[in-house]
UniProtKB/Swiss-Prot annotation:
One of its GO terms (cellular component) is membrane. It comes from Aspergillus oryzae (strain ATCC 42149 / RIB 40) (Yellow koji mold). Its cofactor is heme. Belongs to the cytochrome P450 family. Disruption phenotype: Reduces the production of heptelidic acid. Glycans are attached at residue 491. It is found in: Membrane. Cytochrome P450 monooxygenase; part of the gene cluster that mediates the biosynthesis of heptelidic acid (HA), a sesquiterpene lactone that acts as an inhibitor of glyceraldehyde-3-phosphatedehydrogenase (GAPDH) and a growth inhibitor of the salt-tolerant lactic acid bacteria in soy sauce brewing. This is Cytochrome P450 monooxygenase hepC. Its main location: membrane. It is a single-pass membrane protein. The lineage of its organism: Eukaryota, Fungi, Dikarya, Ascomycota, Pezizomycotina. Pathway: Secondary metabolite biosynthesis. One of its GO terms (molecular function) is oxidoreductase activity, acting on paired donors, with incorporation or reduction of molecular oxygen.
């Protein structure tokens, strides 16, 4: 008798679950305010679809395919839209709109953790604006004048190391990554000093000198890769954080607010105790602190931690993509080298090449911009929350609290903006050439746009322009056949880059 009662209960429960599931699917596909926007069926039902696509490292390419299939606006989760045209991009990220409620989405809480001062993860626009004003001067274009000599020292070290490896095949990407890390000093007091290190702390890390990063890059990449998919599985991150006292830390993303932050605190404390008037980022922040005491020592430590995560990989991928594209396009490489010799003969280049000289070289600028168009350092969607009053996208109403965002990778690969040769490396599109009038060059946004754009973009451009000018001035490079295909690389907020094997030769006189 009891067994007979269990069977109907089972089928009743199954029927209820089935009805609820059907109702949910029907709502998301037919009745949801976002039902009018096209997208993959699975994406309409669960954020898990986006998390999975992110975790396999091909989300940036999947997004391009989706936009080419469905159009400018694609539904990528039950309450999320990806937007792929510049006008909507500017509407979402522009200064005028940012003050009206386009806050960062909840997924950024994974990045922020428990940090009260975090320009990357802070979701509230008002708080972010106040924090950014406190530190902006240290990252301004005017501050770059003080940093050029520090960047040059590291470049000269790289050149010296590469000269010892001439007429050999080397992984140029390895050296470029260590160089990108050096200028901001990767904050590691326990490591030997090098541009992130030199510019942030006036002490480099020593990676270029030793040729070994001592596992630090891998640790940063693990943290960034962990954050990439957890940002779309926030419930799992929150559950993990509550279980840390019982199970310990299993997520690499916590290194940003743990290991690296602790090291940053030691570094900042040591710098304060050491004193001096070094013209580096931390020195400028300490000067700001004198007139704006609300900037605490702890806040400076938070900023120094961000320097490592925001600066090292984005600059490195820009370096490596520039050289990869240059060496796989002989016509562009030959023109650059020809112009180099012409400018040298006219006395327009010195040794070492100055930032002003690199800045005034149009074709060198064109190569950099075109490479950053094809391999944008930040290839993921920058999620924002639509304000309560909602917004219009392509004559369609998007209700408040919907998550919307754009990816530079999608906008930079949009043939409506860049023309039918959108996937082709053509530096000429950045010069005065009527062939490329269709291009809307203002759509290039490798460092985002508006009040949330990358604070370190001026430093990144300075490093990239100086490094490219000086390396082609000193070396002849050719791609080795064993170099892998970069079109297959994966992205997890950082790029999984194959070795950049090149044959290195001293420059021909």
């Amino acid at each position: 008798m009891q067994q007979n009662m269990i069977i109907p209960s089972f089928w009743t429960g199954t029927a209820i679950i089935g009805l609820v599931a059907c109702a949910y699917v029907s709502y998301q596909c037919l009745l949801s305010p976002l039902a009018r926007f096209p997208g993959p069926f699975a994406a309409k039902l669960s954020k898990g679809w986006r998390a999975y696509k992110t975790a396999n490292g091909q989300w940036h390419r999947k997004l391009v395919d989706l936009h080419r299939k469905y159009g400018h606006v694609v539904r990528i989760a039950p309450n999320e839209l990806s937007v792929g045209d510049p006008s909507s991009f500017r509407k979402i990220y522009s200064p005028a709109e940012a003050g009206n409620g386009f806050n960062k989405a909840a997924c950024y809480s994974v990045v922020q953790g428990n940090r009260p001062f975090d320009l990357t993860g802070e979701r509230n626009e008002k708080v972010h604006s106040e924090q950014r004003k406190l530190v902006a001067t240290a990252y301004s274009m005017s501050s770059m004048v003080h940093f050029e000599s520090k960047v040059n020292v590291v470049i000269e070290t790289v050149i010296h190391k590469l000269e010892a490896r001439c007429r050999k095949t080397i992984d140029l990407g390895h050296w470029l990554q260590m160089w990108a890390f050096e200028p901001t000093r990767p904050l590691l007091n326990s490591l030997k000093p090098d541009v992130i290190g030199s510019v942030s702390f006036s002490q480099p890390f020593g990676y270029v000198e030793s040729g070994d990063d001592e596992g630090v890059f891998k640790r940063i990449q693990n943290a960034m890769g962990s954050a990439a998919w957890l940002m779309h599985a926030g419930w799992l991150f929150r559950l993990h954080q509550k279980l840390i006292p019982i199970c310990g830390n299993w997520l690499a993303v916590n290194d940003r607010n743990g290991y690296f932050f602790q090291v940053a605190c030691r570094e900042v404390s040591g710098r304060i105790n050491r004193g001096g008037d070094d013209k580096d980022i931390i020195g400028q922040l300490l000067e700001t602190q004198k007139i704006k005491p609300q900037l605490k020592d702890l806040d400076i430590s938070f900023m120094m931690t961000s320097n490592v995560f925001a600066g090292s990989d984005s600059t490195s991928i820009a370096f490596q993509s520039i050289f990869y594209l240059l060496l796989t396009h002989p016509a562009a490489h030959d023109r650059l080298m020809r112009e180099l010799r012409e400018r040298e003969e006219k006395g327009e280049l010195s040794d070492p090449v100055s930032f002003q000289e690199a800045e005034s070289w149009p074709y060198l600028q064109a190569i950099i911009y075109e490479a950053m168009r094809l391999y944008a350092p930040a290839a993921f969607v920058l999620d924002r929350v639509v304000p309560p009053e909602g917004m219009m996208i392509e004559d369609k109403f998007v209700p408040g609290n919907t998550v919307v965002g754009s990816s530079a990778w999608v906008i930079h690969r949009n043939p409506e903006i860049w023309g039918p040769d959108v996937d082709t490396f053509r530096p000429e599109r950045w010069l005065d050439d009527s062939t490329f009038l269709i291009d809307k060059k203002g759509a290039l946004q490798p460092f985002s746009f508006g009040p949330r754009n990358c604070l370190g973009r001026h430093l990144a451009y300075q490093e990239i322009k100086l490094a490219l000018a000086k390396l082609v001035y000193h070396f002849d490079l050719e791609l080795n056949p064993k170099c892998g295909d970069w079109d297959e690389q994966k992205n997890f907020t950082f790029w999984v880059k194959p070795p950049l094997w090149v044959n290195l030769h001293p420059v021909k006189s």
